[in-house]
Amino acid sequence: MNNSIKKFQDLMKKYLNGDINSKEFSSAFTKLFYEKKQEIIPVNEFKIIEEVWGYLDVFEPDVSKRALYEVLIDEAKFKNEIKKAIKNMEKLKNETNNY
């Protein structure tokens, strides 16, 4: 597996396990997204990572702020999207290994 993809997966798993909070996750994800020494990420995996990136833009843990904008999502929805991303990345890894 590509080392850059593994870093993204490990970061997502840390967040889901509660090892880091959403603010730490957002900061680390952004830093990793713009890492200069990143390996080339295949298009299918990048689409998944980019989708998580998009969810970071609409994730708002504060209920009062979320009420002002209908497009904002809560932590439960965000975690669900992270779980889907990990599952889809694993699926792609397994498909690649079968060829």
Predicted regions and their residues:
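Acidic, Ser/Pro/Thr-rich low-complexity regulatory regions
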Residues: 1-99
